[in-house]
Amino acid sequence: MSTEQGIKAEFYTDKPKTIICDLDGTILKHAHVFSDLDKHDPQLNPGVIEKLNHWDSLGHTIVLMTARKESAREMTERHLRSLGVMWDHLVMGVTSGKRVLINDKLELQDQDRAVAVNVITDIGFNNTDWDGIGL
């Protein structure tokens, strides 16, 4: 295979996706005060566990990220496991400000290789057209 063929295969072959998903307000009901996180049982938002399980069964990589402090990792992982949430990576300590994903594509006219989805806080995953974005 030539270098050019290898590059095209890398960019144009359908492969499992990397799904990067926020935690509070997206996966879990939003707890607005960090110090209250361990005082209440965490709650999943509607449709979340079904979609995460589906994506996992398709071989997608699931990266959860949160503005929670690194010091809350043990508690956060315990909560997620107790709810049956599966993930590949958990990134702690990102800001709660705007998140920007930067990715490349081979040619200007090619389809974008990154997609952003914004769900309404605490509404869950049932009202999103996942098929429309290839998920």
Labelled PLM ranges:
Residues 1-135:
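HAD-like aspartate-dependent phosphatase fold
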